[in-house]
Amino acid sequence: MKAWGTVVVTLATLMVVTVDAKIYERCELAARLERAGLNGYKGYGVGDWLCMAHYESGFDTAFVDHNPDGSSEYGIFQLNSAWWCDNGITPTKNLCHMDCHDLLNRHILDDIRCAKQIVSSQNGLSAWTSWRLHCSGHDLSEWLKGCDMHVKIDPKIHP
């Protein structure tokens, strides 16, 4: 009986989250990331963040992916439940001190705060496999084409 209660609460939470979710348009997300201070943060430009978010979630704040190890990835940046947030299921370090379900809505400042913490580590954006595979070392100017902003990048990261 307790298991059914957990299922009902989880489904109700997911339904509420879905109502408040958002799939961002590229330039809309670029402006949001710039306002949040990610343009040039730790040497990465908004193009880096857009590229990574595109390959992680398709700019979908409600995207959840499940891993073979039992952990899950949440939100626009696909933050992992074993390390960065608590989903109530996976044993976690919860290094961003947050509930994973808080990453599934249109309000992405908490996602950005956690992503800033991750990128501040020695791995930088390399912590995301998608950034290493699809974004690192590539011309990212296409990600900002048609958006009203200027690229700030660190030449040490993007030679």
UniProtKB/Swiss-Prot annotation:
Active-site residues per Swiss-Prot or TrEMBL entry: 56
GO molecular function, one term: lysozyme activity
Organism (species): Homo sapiens
Residue ranges of every copy of the C-type lysozyme domain listed in the record: 22-150
Record-linked InterPro entries: Glyco_hydro_22, Glyco_hydro_22_lys, Lysozyme-like_dom_sf
PROSITE patterns the UniProt entry points to: GLYCOSYL_HYDROL_F22_2 (PS51348)
EC number(s) on file: 3.2.1.17
Protein known as: Sperm acrosome-associated protein 5
Origin organism lineage: Eukaryota, Metazoa, Chordata, Craniata, Vertebrata
GO CC, alphabetical: acrosomal vesicle; extracellular region; sperm flagellum
